[in-house]
Amino acid sequence: MKILVTGANGQVGWELARSLAVLGQVVPLARDEADLGRPETLARIVEDAKPDVVVNAAAYTAVDAAESDGAAAKVVNGEAVGVLAAATKRVGGLFVHYSTDYVFDGTKSSPYIETDPTCPVNAYGASKLLGELAVAETGGDWLTFRTTWVFAARGKNFLRTMLRLAKEREEMKIVADQFGAPTWARSIADGTAHALATAMRERAAGAFTSGVYHMTSAGQTSWHGFADAIVASWRAVPGAAPLAVSRIVPIPTSAYPVPARRPANSVLSNEALKERFGIELPDWRYAVGLCVRDLLSQ
């Protein structure tokens, strides 16, 4: 099986190169090889490679920048995704895509399920919803996995930012009234590999159905709780460099103004993923501990 992975240098893409290798030949494509900012170049790449699977891990992820650069976000997260999905259909392949909790408005009091109405509250979320719709409209075989609060030992993410600040500051003020499930990029990649193995068996048996599924860590917390766990995990590792921070202060969203509005509730239900694919991602606290150790080992 030949698997094309776009966004191969990103947090999830980097992990996919490892997790998908057990399923077949992985062809990782970095941005300079498959630039979603240039949708007109993408169909040729897929059609020339003729993969069995295309996994799109590339995205425009600058949430605040998207408020003033919405056109670029729509091209990368919307138009380009549709081009990739359509090209994958033409070569008879399966298209796998990632989306976000930000397609919801965050007003629900319980975890979101896949069929809840979408209502993005920022430009980034709107662009990701465009991508979801573009994939579905191709009529091909596809899977879209929505995830939340992605972190990794590499790249730009909340975990790495918190550790940098914790080394520099005695006090950090972190938002405590937004809730979600911090999800390790490695967990997403491993979950994708398991789901893909099942999906390919279903396709071979003529029993495959396309759909959207939520794929996040077990459990939930606030950004403040996430930051607290990151610092605690670092300090729990023998020999880890000392951190300057002594106080992590909870603050409301209103005390940390940013260009893009964030959903208050980003918790997604993973029950549909478990039911179809038998997948349960580890608890977010456990994943944070493993990721911190991974970072320290580099």
Swiss-Prot record:
Binding site for NADH: G10, Q11, V12, D35, L36, A59, Y60, T61, Y124, K128
InterPro entries named in the record: dTDP_dehydrorham_reduct, NAD(P)-bd_dom_sf, RmlD-like-bd
Feature type site, description Could provide a fine-tuning to achieve optimal pKa matching between active site and substrate: T100
EC class: oxidoreductase
Keyword entries, A-Z: Carbohydrate metabolism, Lipopolysaccharide biosynthesis, Magnesium, Metal-binding, NAD, NADP, Oxidoreductase
Domain of life: Bacteria
GO cellular component annotations of the record: cytosol
Record-annotated active site: Y124 (proton donor/acceptor)
Residues that bind NADPH: Q11, V12, D35, L36, A59, Y60, T61, Y98, Y124, K128
Gene Ontology MF term list: dTDP-4-dehydrorhamnose reductase activity; metal ion binding
Cofactor binding: number and manner: Binds 1 Mg(2+) ion per monomer.
Annotated metabolic or biological route of this protein: Carbohydrate biosynthesis; dTDP-L-rhamnose biosynthesis; Bacterial outer membrane biogenesis; LPS O-antigen biosynthesis
The keyword Magnesium is annotated on this UniProt entry: yes
One biological process term in Gene Ontology: O antigen biosynthetic process
The keyword NAD belongs to this UniProt entry's keyword annotation: yes
The protein's assembly and partners: Homodimer.
Task performed by this protein: Involved in the biosynthesis of the dTDP-L-rhamnose which is an important component of lipopolysaccharide (LPS). Catalyzes the reduction of dTDP-6-deoxy-L-lyxo-4-hexulose to yield dTDP-L-rhamnose.
Family designation: Belongs to the dTDP-4-dehydrorhamnose reductase family.
Protein name: dTDP-4-dehydrorhamnose reductase
Gene that produces this protein: rmlD
